[in-house]
Each structure stands twice: as C-alpha cells, then as structure tokens.
Amino acid sequence: MFQKLKDYIKKDWKFMLLILGFMLLNLIIVTINYSTDCDGIYINGLFKTWYSTISVIMIIVLGGFLAFKVRNADKDNIKLEKLYLWVAIPIGLIMCFNTPLGKVPDEDDHCKKAMAISQGNFFSVADENGNAIEMINAKVHEFVTRTVDNYDDALRRATLPETEEKIPLKYNTMALYAPICHAPQAFGIFITRLFGAGITVQCYAGRLVNFAVGLVLLYNAIRLIPFKKYLVTYLALLPVTFNVLPSMSSDTLTIGMSFFYIAYILHLKYNEEVKEITKKDKVALTISTLIISLCKIVYIPLCILLLIIPKEKYGSLKKKNIFTIIVIISAIALNLIWLGYCSRYLIEFNTGVNSKEQVLFILTHPIEYIMILARTINFYFNTYYAGLSGDALGSYTVKASEIYICATIGLTSILMLGNIEGDKKVKIDWFTRLIAAMAFIAIVLLIYTSLYVQWNPYMNPLIHGVQPRYFFPIIFLTSLIIDNDLLVIKKKINRFILTYATFFNINVATATIYTYYFGVLINTYIK
C-alpha cells in the first residue's frame, strides 16, 4: 500500500507539491486571520473555533478533492466544460450560503425587484415624487439589507416570524431594469412560494435558480468556444464571477449571456463543422441579442459581433445583411421602447447632478470630455484591475490575499497573450479584431458616459461610480483584439490554472466567513 502511494507521488510529484503549496498558503492566511483578532490559537493547526475547522475542511478536503479531479480529468476523459461544473458547483454553493443575503452589491434592490416580478408586477409604479415603489413583504426589507454586519445578525433576521404585512419600498435604479434581468430569481421565488415556503427560503431559491442559469450559460460558452477554452474557463472561475453568480444580482445573467453570446458567434465563425447558419442558430442569435440588449443598454454594441460571421455560412451576402440588420434594429428598437417607458424613473440621485446639462456639455466639449475620460481611467486604473482580480468582494468588505490578487493579474495577462499547446490555434483576421475593438470601445464609452450623465455633478473632473465588474462581461474581447500568438504556453499549465482558481476561491470563501463571523472589515493580506 505504502509502495503504491510512494509510486503515485513519485509519478507526479510536481503537481502534488503544487497542491500542498496552495494548501499551505491558504492555511497560513487562515492562521494570520485567526491570530490577529482572536486568542487561543494552536500554531500546530488544531483550531478551536468553527471558523478554523470549516476553513481547514474547505482547504484540505474540498481543495484536495477538486485538485485531484483536475489532475485526473484527462485520464477520466472529462471534457473541460464538465470539469468546470465539478469545480464551479461546490464553490458556488459555498458562496451562496456563506455570503449573507444583501452582501453583494445592490442585492437588496435586486431582491425587491425579483420579489415584485414574482408577484406578477413586471412594471414599477411611480409615486408623486417620481420614485419607483412596490408593495413588498415587510420581512424582505428586514432580511435582505446591506447593513447586516455578521452571521448572528443575518441568522436573527432570517428566523424572524413570517408576516403578511406589506410595505412600500423604493428601488429607483432597479426600475430601469427590464423584467428579463430578474426572471430567474423571480422564478425561484415564485415556485417556492407556491409550496408555502417562507421569505428566507424564497430568497435563497432565487439565488440558486439564478446561479443555475449562470452556470448553464457559462458551461455552454466553454463548450462552444472554438479556441481559448482555458481562458474562458479561467475567467468563469475567478472570484469576481462567483461574487455575483450565486446571488440575486442581474449581473449573473449579464455575465453569463455575454460570455455565451461571444462564444456562440465565434463558434459559428471558426468551427469548420458549421457549414451553414440554421434556423436554430438564427433563433438562438436573435434571442441572445435581445436579452443582452435588455440586460443593460451599455452592452448593446456586442450585437455588432454578428458582422464577423462569414456570408458563406448564410448562403449569400444578401441573406447575411438582411438577418443582421433585422436583429440589430430589433435590439435597438426594443431598447428604445423600454427606455421610453422607464425614463419616468430617471431621477438625479446625487447633489449637483444635471443630466440635460451634462449631455450638452459632452456634445459641445468633446475634447474636454475625452480628457476627463483619460484622467478617470488613469486615476482608477489600479482599482479596476485589482477589482477584476478579486479585491473588495462581497459588499466591498471581503478582501482576498494580496498574493492571489497579484498572481491573478499576471496569470490573466499571460493567458490573454498566449496560446496553450493543444488548444485549437486560430488566426484571427483583421476584420474580427476591428469589430471586437469597436464593440469594446463603444461599451466602455457607454459605461463611463451613462454614469457621468446620471451619477456625477455637472462638469465633474472625474467620473465616479464605475465599478470594475462592469467591464467583466467584455473582458474576453481583449484577447480577440491583441495578438494572441505572442506566447506559447505548455499544456501542463491547464492543470495549474484550474487548481489555482479552486484554491483562490477557497481563500475568498474563508475570508468571507471570517468577515461575517467577526463582523469586521478585514485585510487577509500577507505583507
């Protein structure tokens, strides 16, 4: 027996050492957290608290199991998209239940909107001041709130007695979202309500259904993408993804649908087995385009990616142009109709905001506005990059290890610039690069401009309010724009990528438990 174990370790000692290294790193971080604010720690690893016990179980048992699942994937003939589910499902479930409701950005308002839709109220009602209001169960207001500081507080609110009382709750920003954005969450809430479940169960059902929809979309994105499969898988496993995936945020649908949409179009263009665009493909493209355009209007430029599909796969240039024009015009028209309806809820949230004057300023002073954009990007660049790499998760209070954040920045750059041996190598033509660049730039401009108009004071020298997660749905486009033949990466890195992402998420999970157990703003940095 011992000889077999010895041979097993000797056969792949480098990977074994890698796993032990990740385990040790995470255990050190847990130890630092524990010893910083708590007494009674045993340095030999025998922890007294449930926090330490759960952390050790996640690091050693779950981390070890998933790492060896990754190691044996080739031998067990597990496809990459299925391997993604093996890692994503347990990580997502942990994040779903160890992050208190409301501790994801804007989740309190997303929950109210989903509750309203589950009751059949697809369109908000405005009060005399123009605020969007809805009669929501009083327990929702008490239970799903971003003021929860710790698990004790969250548990107390979750176990409050059920009530039939309804109170008017405002959610102005959510009134701008089309009902489709909260359809998965609303479905989970509606089904559990049919079976007589209380508010707590309804809310977690909303999270779980939303999580399932996001997983299905990302699974199919990995399955369909003809190249850069490991990059897509890696991005889909980053903590910034799992920060919103198992929540009630509409960002789940936005991220999942954007990844799926890009992958599907690239599949139709570069997959040699796809000889023609079928009716099924046209239906899928049309529905996907309309959903993306309704998720957030700033992402509507993604629809120009339809232009990269070769005319030969439509049968003729005329057929391609007719279909593409109809789909794009339909998406724009649908957005204009929705914007025309919900514009009644466009109110100025902050002091000094004047949307009409701000639009006029941008149109009449384009050079000055470009300078404001450049100044903002330069000022917040580190914040954006760190945020996309795992800094300030949860409701901006959960911080991953600085080691993981720095490593993620480097690893993401390498995967963007290179190709893994064995992955399908595709020469991206100049037209695809151009369209991808146009879509990327247009979306970035819309993100900044929409917030500058609605959120920032008139002629403000910086654009505040832009969150790093806003860029995540389009991050893959950068790999289409830049030359991806600059590096040739050894195939063995694929195991490292998935193992790294697994332990990074476990680090975030333990940091989340630490944050909400002690109710403090933590730094899990190793200096």
Go through the PLM ranges and name each one.
Residues 119-205:
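Interfacial juxtamembrane loops and adjacent helix segments
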Residues 266-277, 300-331:
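Perimembrane helix-loop-helix junctions
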Residues 336-422:
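Membrane-lumen/periplasm interface segments of multi-pass, membrane-embedded glycan/lipid transferases
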Residues 247-254:
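Short acidic/glycine- and proline-prone juxtamembrane loop motifs at membrane-interface regions
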Residues 1-23, 45-93, 322-328, 428, ...:
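Start-transfer (signal-anchor) and selected internal transmembrane alpha helices
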Residues 197-200, 219-242:
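Transmembrane-helix signature of polytopic, membrane-embedded enzymes
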Residues 243, 280-297, 302-308:
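Membrane-interface alpha helices of multi-pass inner-membrane proteins
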Residues 30-54, 339-353, 493-527:
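Transmembrane helical bundles and short interhelical boundary loops of multi-pass, membrane-embedded
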